[in-house]
Amino acid sequence: MAEPTHRLEVRGLSAWYGEAQALRDVDLTVGHGEVVTLVGRNGAGKTTLLRSVMGLHRHATGSVVLDGTDASRLNPDARARRGLGWVPDDRGIYASLSVEENLLLPPVTRPESAWSLEQVYAEFPVLRERADFPGTRLSGGEQQMLAMARVLRSGATLLLLDEPSEGLAPVIVQRIGEIIRTIKAQGTSVLLVEQNVTFAATVADRHHLLAQGRVVESLDNDEFRARREELLDHLGM
């Protein structure tokens, strides 16, 4: 059987908070080994979209298709077994556990694609150096690396990253970009929420611009770079 064209396909996704509609009929795709960003102002619906794809936001309609199979009715654990990995903007680090315990705690959901602890330490050497530190003793950038590494160790092949560069020093943002490009080269897909458009342009293949819960522009990276100022003015960013 031929491999599905898209790792992820979202069709007609709408979502609500009570009576307030947060997403309006969103369509998007993420290919195998592709990095796609969601760009927009605060409140545009970017995080709600990630949460809906992961199955964490239940007040949603439309379909989420993973590797050609409709996953819309699956709970978050079942979607994780299909290869989805969620990295929230608060990183979700367990304060009472060491770095290594944080890495080992989540279950391996896809053994065939799970990174070993040695693979994690090879790609994230700072985590080996800090293995016995409490997770929340790490810097913001180190915590972001830990959150990403933990999801890769579980076997995720499509990462949902929410604002990975937020609040980080430029040199750390550069390192996060290097990691994203490395896992992309290994075939991992990424759907990335990001307001740092300079960073987004260094890692992404395509971009979806969101405003008031709608995708208002979809562009490849070359067009995004060429029209950057115009687009940011349009979005009020």
How should these model regions be labeled?
Residues 159-163:
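Catalytic Walker B motif of ABC-type/P-loop ATPase nucleotide-binding domains
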Residues 134-138, 142:
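Conserved ABC ATPase signature
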Residues 18, 59, 74, 99-117, ...:
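ABC-type ATPase nucleotide-binding domains, specifically the catalytic core motifs of the NBD
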Residues 39-41:
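The feature captures the beta-strand-to-loop junction immediately N-terminal to the Walker
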Residues 54:
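Helix-to-loop junction immediately C-terminal to a conserved catalytic motif
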Residues 152-157:
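A short, proline-enriched helix->beta-strand linker immediately N-terminal to the Walker B motif
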Residues 63-80, 221-224:
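ABC ATPase NBD Q-loop/coupling interface
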